[in-house]
Amino acid sequence: MINKNISIQINGEPFNCSEPLSLQFLLNYLDFNSERIAIEINSTLLPERLFHSTYINDQDKVEIITIVGGG
C-alpha cells in the first residue's frame, strides 16, 4: 500500500497528514466548535451541513473563521 502524504494550508499555515480527512474530523482534531465558525475551502464558503461529508484534498487551502459575539 502506498502512503501519500497530504499537504494543506490552514489559515495560511502548512498542515500535513498521512491520509484524507473529513472536514469534521479536522475540526475536532483542532478542537474547533463547528457551531461558531465559518469555513472556506479554496475560497468557497462551505455550509455546516457539509462538514461531515467534505474531505480535504492535497493542496487545499482551508480558512477557519471563528465567529465571536459581542456587545
From Swiss-Prot:
Gene3D superfamilies: 3.10.20.30. Its main location: plastid. The keyword Plastid applies. InterPro entries: Beta-grasp_dom_sf, Mopterin_synth/thiamin_S_b, Thi_S, ThiS/MoaD-like. Transmembrane segments: none annotated. Keywords: Chloroplast, Plastid. It is found in: Plastid, Chloroplast. GO terms for cellular component: chloroplast. The keyword Plastid applies. Belongs to the ycf40 family. This is Uncharacterized protein ycf40. It comes from Porphyra purpurea.
